[in-house]
Amino acid sequence: SAASDVYKRQQESIAIENDDKIFNIRDCVYISKNINVPVILDYHHHICNHDELDINDYLKDILSSWHNATPKMHFSSPKNKTKKDFRSHNDYINVDAFINFIDILKPFNHDVDIMIEAKAKDEALFRLVRELKYKTNYTFIDDTSFEV
């Protein structure tokens, strides 16, 4: 029926993301396995709410939760290191922290889409790309996509 087709499409568009205060990555992987939805890893949220969990212990499950789709991830830098502002997004991305995140993902040899969350929006993205081109040997496919 048309209603069941709509329901199926809605169900297929649901994903779960770890947050910065309550649901950590372990919680999301557990939920994902029980209701078969993909996990969006928000790395900044993981840093804020890691509960001493090693992200490497969960990446295989996060990546496989997407089945044949490209996994989605979010990356942002904290506004500053004070407890009050650590959870807030910076205007720009800290390139060294981003490179470190890519280095964490590299051993899994898996394509991912990383959404940059920064107050300066496109300007932050293009600054990050310039810094990556200067600091790394990544192979750029287009203006903002690269291979490691």
What residue spans do the PLM features occupy?
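Glycine-enriched alpha-helix->loop->beta-strand junction motifs that scaffold or abut catalytic
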Residues: 9-12, 33-40
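Short acidic, Gly/Ser-rich segments with clustered Asp/Glu that frequently serve as metal-coordination loops
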Residues: 23, 44-49
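Long, repeat-rich segments with strong aromatic
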Residues: 30-32, 41, 50
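Histidine-acidic metal/acid-base catalytic patches
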Residues: 37, 48-148
